Amino acid sequence: MNRRSPAFTARLIFTGVALASGGIAFYVPLLLSTVGLAHSGAWAAGILFGTNLGRLAGSHLASRHGVFTQRRGAIVGNILLEGAALFSMAFIAAPAGLVAVATLAGLGSGLSFPGMKNALMRLQGMDSARLFAGLSLALRLGMAMGYLAGALVGASHLVAVFSVLLAMFVGYAAFMDLAMRGIEAADVDVPQAPIAVGSTPGAAADVPAVAPPSDMTAMLLMNAAFWFLTIQPTVTMSLYVPRYVPGLAVSTTYWVTTVTVLLLQMRVTRLPRGAAGHRLFLAIGIVCMAASFATMALAGSHVAPVLVAAVLLALSQVFYSPSLDVLVTGDARARGLDLGKTMARQLFWQNLGMMSGSLFAGALFDQALRLGTPSLGWSVPATASMALLAAWALGMRGKRN
């Protein structure tokens, strides 16, 4: 494979993303369970809240200023900012300090992630659906390794965990730097056809205009709601499992979810056909999420239902995430929008959902503890998932009429 080929460049990006996601997966369950047991579920959720608050601010800036999604130095620098901020967590004991540093790390993530996705879209002749599926696969492969490492290491070695995490982010920055150099060289070497004002030079030309312009706002709002709900297990599993299923390692459910995605993502991505197929996959993803929450509400202290719920949660992401990316990208293409800014806008709404959802999850878990009804932390999200599905179905029916 030629070092300048788009496929090679995509693999560089995917390798870097896998390193970063592995680092995040390595520390998150360990830190959340440690803080949750030592302080409260609200403080544990506050760390994710701070992370997503920073991502929200970063993605907002990236959606307004193209330098953050186009310039190699800005993308690489913000990756290093995130890694350095996370490393400093190894030396902070106060939960408020952890929240503050998590916010700074989130800022770096929110500024760099849209640029990474935009870089993928600048690759010549690459199929967009496969690129997004490959990105999801890289994220999950890294997460699988990170969760497995976390299960083996445990929460008593956090300095070592964060040292490894820093090295992984340095690796991500290096791979992204190499990839961006290749993309910049390709943009110079390949003459560009005239493009619409505001579109991204060098982006993959095969992205279909699968979503009419009027769908964008509805998709972004639904995406915020979806991630509001999807973030619930990230918080609640870390708090629920040590208390109610103590025989199960806290990272196991995350690992099961990740391995399921790895096994199915590329196969499932080939199935949808056109806009209708991708919209159907969004609905299937929401149904799987609701089923996962309902299973957890009935799980009690049994291991098997917890693992089944982890598989269902994985299926929700397998069906939902790549299809949403394809629909948003298709809409941006149809309207001649800057892809980098569009990706940043999508990330803004996603982080808004995750930020508010993480705080809600921690507060809901604490309330469930006070009431002595642990199922409350799962039955409320299950009901909300069905409400989201109904709203989406009604919206799509209205558009057809």
Regions found by a protein language model. Name each.
Residues 1-8, 180-222:
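Juxtamembrane intracellular "pre-TM" segments in multi-pass secondary transporters
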Residues 2-52, 215-255:
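Helix-loop boundary and gating motifs at the non-cytosolic
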Residues 31, 111-124, 319-335:
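Intracellular juxtamembrane helix-capping segments at the cytosolic ends
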